[in-house]
Amino acid sequence: MAKELIFGHQNPDTDAIGTAIAYSYLQNKLGYDTEAVALGEANDETKYALNKFGFTAPRVIKTASNEVDAVMLVDHNEPQQSVSDIDKVKVTHVVDHHRIMNFNTADPLYYRAAPVGCTSTIMWQMYNEKEIEIPQDIAGIMLSAIISDTLLLKSPTTTDQDKEAVEALANIAGVNYKEYGLKMLKAGTNIADKSEEDLIDLDAKSFELNGSNVRVAQINVVDLPEALERKEAFLKAMDEASKSEGYDMFMLLITNILDSDSEALVVGSDESKAKFEKAFNTKLSDSEVKLPGVVSRKKQVVPPLTNAFEA
């Protein structure tokens, strides 16, 4: 059987990398020849999780077709979020928990998606269905992914399935998930040593909304006022990125992981800003607005933006 690469989205988070590792282990147990790779360097939070459970970060690839003919995707499906030459390889499997958009294939494939908080929750279910024993390190990295995506089960995306998976995986991994989870999340909040340009690209995704190219980035912090001291520098970096990459709107969500509130910074045309204001029923003040209780890009940001841009 020919080798296949497994990877998550660009600017990978803990779910994108952790689930790729877990899926590669599962598929290899089932007779496939796979390797987990990444479409970018691991962030600080992910590095903390990888180190905790004894993994080295997957190697980073820029293209896939120079290595393999087929790939498996986790934690994404939209082509603009995938490897640059996704149109040159065959997608044989997808496991995801996001909306399906601009995705089509020439051949039938395995596609599994569910509205849960994290792709690793689906992966945990797949291990159980296949009756494949989950090793301690794999359990740990899947646990880390769920904690990351659900903000320690506090995100509105959290489901009973996520909670069940966390309990089971923490037991296998041998950790107190609340204590470990808080340490892991805090490891990803150190922004002092990073440039604004790096921060707005660390966890960012592009969305095509009714012909508009919308970029939504998110950074997690424990000190929101400190992060907002860099507001003007953030806006400058966002504006420059929009001009160079052709974004019609760039939104940066700065989320306080301790109180589950966010502040949004927005750059773009007057028309796109008006659509942002309509989406969240609010008014921007100097390109900034508070978004109380908003922590999930997938559930609380993209759906209202989609509705506003398509209205």
UniProtKB/Swiss-Prot annotation:
Its EC number is 3.6.1.1. Its main location: cytoplasm. The keyword Cell division does not apply. It is found in: Cytoplasm. It comes from the Bacteria. GO terms for cellular component: cytoplasm. The keyword Metal-binding applies. Its cofactor is Mn(2+). It catalyses: diphosphate + H2O = 2 phosphate + H(+). Keywords: Cytoplasm, Hydrolase, Manganese, Metal-binding. Binds 2 manganese ions per subunit. Mn(2+) 2 binds at D15, D75, H97, D149. Mn(2+) 1 binds at H9, D13, D75. GO terms for molecular function: inorganic diphosphate phosphatase activity; manganese ion binding. SUPFAM superfamilies: DHH phosphoesterases. It holds the Pfam family DHHA2. NCBIfam families: PRK05427.1. Belongs to the PPase class C family. This is Probable manganese-dependent inorganic pyrophosphatase. It comes from Lactobacillus gasseri (strain ATCC 33323 / DSM 20243 / BCRC 14619 / CIP 102991 / JCM 1131 / KCTC 3163 / NCIMB 11718 / NCTC 13722 / AM63). The lineage of its organism: Bacteria, Bacillati, Bacillota, Bacilli, Lactobacillales. The gene is ppaC.
